[in-house]
Amino acid sequence: MKVTYEIENGKKVEVITYDDGVFMKFDENGNEIHFKSSDGDEFWSEYDENGNEIHCKDSNGFEVWNEYDENGKKIHSKNSDGDEWWSEYDANGNEIHFKNNIGSEQWREYDTNGNEIHFKDNHGFEDWYEYDTNGNVIHYKDNDGYEFWHEYDENGNCIHFKNSDGYEQWFEYDTNENCIHCKDTDGVEYWY
């Protein structure tokens, strides 16, 4: 690996070159502005004053443009193939609405801890999540009738899994919280 510095447009850039031909160039803020893979593909990126990637292109002519809100969240993207997508966020920065120009749309709801508790899309799929006080998923269900449950020990390790199809798994851990034993309702058993 070889590291050099250059002046580009009046600004110092770091250049890293590897023996296999990989080449990377970073701006003064540490953002990758140019990448060349060992097979010759190249990528260039531009950033706004907050370090958000606003434009990228590759050596095949594919390009992507991005827009961000005042909190640095990506709110709009479009590419040179004509694909376009938009996102909206709540006051905590969680994505609550997503849509694209090919007809997909999604909505999400969150609890006060920022955990996703509800998802639905415009194709009719919907699911719900419940969490324990540590933020671990303890119950999941979807509108197709599938459900699963998790139980955790005091260290947050999953000790039991059960789903609506009747399948179950049990887990045991050592004092270092490494899983040492697992068994399920199919008769499969592992020791680690």
Where are the language model's segments positioned?
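Thr-biased low-complexity repeat/linker tracts and other Thr-enriched repetitive architectures
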Residues: 28-188
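N-terminal targeting and processing segments
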Residues: 1-30
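Short amphipathic alpha-helical segments
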Residues: 1, 190-192
